[in-house]
Amino acid sequence: NTIPYIKSKERAIKYGNYFKKQILKLKKINPKAMFLIIGPADMAKKQKTEMITYPILVEVISALKNAAFETNSCFWDMYLNMGGENSIIDWSKKTPSLAARDYIHFTNKGAREIADLFIEDLMNDFKNYLENKNEN
């Protein structure tokens, strides 16, 4: 995971540009390929005596969204779907826990929960697509 190693907005933008180049390379190999980028989950680190979301996380997500949109790819925001800032802390406190006490990884139940959220969004978007397709 790159989040702990990205320390500035400039590095986040550079990471997003690198990611964009990787998508473009794959599209060059297969121009018909479609991509769905899944953004990173919330993750936290200790600051003084409390756990907080990595401060650079939102910048990295923004850079990845830009890379996705600039390459006509789709983007699913896992961070936002979890609940945003400090949500990993809430997920770890649930019973049963949805996130490990490292505040980075999901438990098996948490992985199923995030998968369910993703599938729900995907199916809703597909339903909207079919409705709009039939109207046109």
Where are these regions (language model features)?
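Alpha-helix N-cap and loop-to-helix initiation/capping positions
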Residues: 10-18, 52-59
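Proline-aspartate-enriched helix->loop->beta-strand connector
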Residues: 1, 31-32
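Short, structurally constrained coil/turn elements
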Residues: 29-31, 69
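Amphipathic, non-transmembrane alpha-helical secondary structure
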Residues: 13-20, 24, 112, 116, ...
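Oxyanion-hole/transition-state-stabilizing segment in secreted/luminal serine hydrolases
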Residues: 1-14, 42-43
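Conserved, well-ordered alpha-helix/loop/beta-strand core segments that scaffold catalytic motifs
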Residues: 19-23, 27, 34-39, 43, ...
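Catalytic His-Asp segment of secreted/periplasmic serine-dependent ester chemistry enzymes
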Residues: 42-136
